[in-house]
Amino acid sequence: MEKKRYSKRYCRYTEAKISFIDYKDLDMLKHTLSERYKIMPRRLTGNSKKWQERVEVAIKRARHMALIPYIVDRKKVVDSPFKQH
């Protein structure tokens, strides 16, 4: 059985030379969240270990401040979680 290979992805934060991830900047955080607002793994986002840890902390802070929900009802899952209706 062959291993599943993922395409090479590059860290968007390193390329953009960002020095700080703000938990209030949801446009930046939405790239690492799934449609159910779960944190996606590094192999899918392409983030480096350093930036993945910083993004996780920012997402957890945003959840604590109620900017992002902790859980989503299965019936209310949308295509894009940040799309305004």
Swiss-Prot record:
GO molecular function annotation: small ribosomal subunit rRNA binding; structural constituent of ribosome
Protein name: Small ribosomal subunit protein bS18
Top-level taxon of the source organism: Bacteria
Keywords from the named record: Ribonucleoprotein, Ribosomal protein, RNA-binding, rRNA-binding
Family classification: Belongs to the bacterial ribosomal protein bS18 family.
Pfam families for this protein: Ribosomal_S18
This protein's encoding gene: rpsR
InterPro entries reported for this sequence: Ribosomal_bS18, Ribosomal_bS18_CS, Ribosomal_bS18_sf
Keyword hit for DNA-binding: no
Gene Ontology cellular component annotations, sorted alphabetically: cytosolic small ribosomal subunit
PANTHER family xrefs: 30S RIBOSOMAL PROTEIN S18, SMALL RIBOSOMAL SUBUNIT PROTEIN BS18M
Summary of the function given for this chain in its UniProt record: Binds as a heterodimer with protein bS6 to the central domain of the 16S rRNA, where it helps stabilize the platform of the 30S subunit.
GO biological process: translation
Description of how the protein assembles with itself and partners: Part of the 30S ribosomal subunit. Forms a tight heterodimer with protein bS6.
Biological source species: Helicobacter acinonychis (strain Sheeba)
